[in-house]
Amino acid sequence: MSDLPLDLVEEILSRVSATSLKRLRSTCKQWNTLFKKRSFSQKHFHIAPKESMVLMLKEYRVCSMNINLNVSPPSVEFQGTLGIKDDSHSNLGQVEIVEVYHCDGLLLCATRDNRLVVWNPCLGETRWIQLKDECRRYSTFALGYENNKFCRRNYKILRYWGWFHDHIPDDGGRFRFEIYDFRSDSWKVLDDVPDDRFPPRDLIILVFRHLEIMVLWLYQLLEKNNSQCYKRLRHQRWRYL
């Protein structure tokens, strides 16, 4: 393919599946540069054949699975563990994952040592995100994006966490909501969320996996009690896939 025009090469590669592109990245530097272009990513997203990947969190590792529903009984086969690149560790197996959130083919992983990483398992790319503190007790995360027609998707993370006083019966605890913006690489605290408007401890441990569910819940909770916070959340325009 080295003799083909670059636009024709791009047209051919844009029809290759994502898992195959991962193997091609080390084949040619010119191709690897092409894969990083925004225009190619958008074209590949719309043209390439869609693939499904079944993943399972097992013993702090993300494992790929093969599920066959066409046999009786249906079979489930573990295909192996997917390693996450971590520049601070030489061994890929040292990254222990406790929670995984999904959006648009990306995985948001919370590690056992209180770190966050956004991971593209098809391409093997990672982005480590610094938390401003190490207090993750009762933390819940959600990964989504702001859909703006004038620019590409701006991915964001919603963090919802709290702490409790064990010696106080029926204590509602204290809570914080933070939003991480990928473009600015920064966290923003929603500091006007009232502490006294949340359900008791037994309801807090419910996991709100989807941004739309999380934000809708906040709408209903805060609409009549804190109009300013309600408006701020309402205009985030989240999407979750």
From Swiss-Prot:
Family matches, as InterPro entries: F-box-assoc_interact_dom, F-box-like_dom_sf, F-box_dom, SCF_F-box_component
PROSITE patterns listed in its UniProt record: FBOX (PS50181)
Protein name: F-box protein At3g22350
Record NCBIfam families: F_box_assoc_1
Database matches in Gene3D superfamilies: 1.20.1280.50
A Pfam family the protein falls into: F-box
CDD domains: F-box_AtFBW1-like
Biological classification of the source: Eukaryota, Viridiplantae, Streptophyta, Embryophyta, Tracheophyta
Limits of the F-box domain: 1-44
Organism field: Arabidopsis thaliana
